[in-house]
C-alpha cells in the first residue's frame, strides 16, 4: 500500500495548494533559509507540488525534488513552467521512492518538509529512507525534516470514524467550492499507525455535488524514537525545534518536531 494515498486519489494534486492548512503553513521560509545556509545543492524528498521547492530555487539554490506521485510532480512542473528561466534551470524533479533511490550525486542538504517521513509506517522503511539519504549526502551534510509531535491525549481517543469539520472551506480557480473533513478509521497503538480519510465535499458551479475520499496512513514517531533512528543511521542530532521560528522543543505541546541532523560517518547496515 502507498501509505500517502496520493496516487489512489487523482484529485489531490489539483486541490493540494488550495487547502487552507497547507497554504498557510509557516515552514517555507524555514526550509528556504536552511537551503541558503547550506549553499546547495539540496535534495527535497516528497517535493509534491513544489510548495517548498520553487521558493528554494527562487532564492538562488540548486534543488532536486523527488516524489512518488506522478500527479504531484506534474503539478510541480506546471508551477515551475510559470517561473523565469533562471529559476527553472535551478530545479529538477523526478519520480522516485524515498525508501530506495539512486541519483548518482551528493548534496549538502536533504530536506523532507511536511511529514512525508511519517508515511513510512515500519522501522525497516524508515531506516531504508535514512540509508538512502546518507548515501546522497556530502561529508558533514545535513538532513532537516519535520513530523508532528504525537499528542498522547489524542492517541487515547478511539477511532470512531466520525467526520470532523475543523477547516475553512476553499474555492478552486474553476469555481468549485470545497469543504474538507477528516476522520480516523483505525489507531493501531502497537504499530503506532493511524489510518484516516480526508473527505472532500465538492459543490460545482452548476450545483452538482461530489464526495471525494483520500485514504492515508501515518506513523506516530516520538522524539527520542526519532533520535535513536537517526543515530542508528549514522546521524547526530544538532537541533530539535517545536515550531518553524526555532522555538526549543518542549516550549509548547504538542507542537511540531523539527530535526536538524548532521551526517557523522558511514555505519553498518542493520536489519529491521
What role is predicted for each listed range?
Residues 1-48:
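Conserved class I S-adenosyl-L-methionine
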Residues 217-272:
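C-terminal lobe and adjacent flexible extensions of AdoMet/dcAdoMet transferase-like proteins
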Residues 102-109:
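A short acidic, Gly/Pro-enriched loop at the edge of an enzyme's catalytic core
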Residues 54-100:
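Class I SAM-dependent methyltransferase SAM/SAH-binding core
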Residues 51:
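Conserved SAM/SAH-binding loop-helix junction
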Residues 145-227:
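SAM-dependent methyltransferase
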Amino acid at each position: 500500500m502507498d501509505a500517502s494515498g496520493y496516487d489512489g486519489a487523482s484529485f489531490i494534486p489539483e486541490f493540494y495548494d488550495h487547502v487552507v492548512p497547507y497554504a498557510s503553513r509557516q515552514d517555507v521560509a524555514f526550509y528556504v533559509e536552511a537551503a541558503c545556509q547550506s549553499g546547495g545543492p539540496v535534495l527535497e524528498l516528497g517535493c509534491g507540488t513544489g510548495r517548498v521547492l520553487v521558493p528554494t530555487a527562487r532564492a538562488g539554490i540548486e534543488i532536486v525534488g523527488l516524489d512518488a506521485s506522478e500527479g504531484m510532480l506534474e503539478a510541480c512542473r506546471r508551477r515551475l513552467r510559470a517561473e523565469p528561466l533562471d529559476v527553472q534551470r535551478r530545479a529538477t524533479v523526478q519520480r522516485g521512492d524515498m525508501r530506495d533511490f539512486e541519483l548518482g550525486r551528493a548534496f549538502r542538504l536533504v530536506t523532507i518538509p511536511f511529514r512525508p517521513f511519517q508515511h513510512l509506517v515500519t522501522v525497516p522503511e524508515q531506516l531504508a529512507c535514512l540509508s538512502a539519504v546518507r548515501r546522497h549526502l556530502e561529508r558533514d551534510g545535513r538532513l532537516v525534516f519535520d513530523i508532528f509531535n504525537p499528542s498522547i491525549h489524542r492517541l487515547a481517543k478511539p477511532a470512531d470514524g466520525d467526520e470532523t469539520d475543523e477547516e475553512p472551506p476553499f474555492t478552486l480557480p474553476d469555481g468549485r467550492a470545497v469543504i474538507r473533513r477528516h476522520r480516523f478509521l483505525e489507531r493501531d497503538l502497537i504499530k503506532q499507525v493511524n489510518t484516516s480519510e480526508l473527505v472532500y465535499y465538492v459543490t460545482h458551479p452548476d450545483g452538482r455535488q461530489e464526495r471525494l475520499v483520500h485514504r492515508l496512513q501515518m506513523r506516530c514517531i516520538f522524539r527520542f524514537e526519532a533520535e535513536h533512528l537517526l543515530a542508528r543511521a549514522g546521524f547526530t542530532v544538532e537541533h530539535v525545534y517545536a515550531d518553524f521560528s526555532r522555538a526549543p522543543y518542549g516550549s509548547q505541546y504538542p507542537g511540531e518536531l523539527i530535526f536538524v541532523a548532521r551526517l557523522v560517518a558511514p555505519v553498518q547496515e542493520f536489519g529491521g
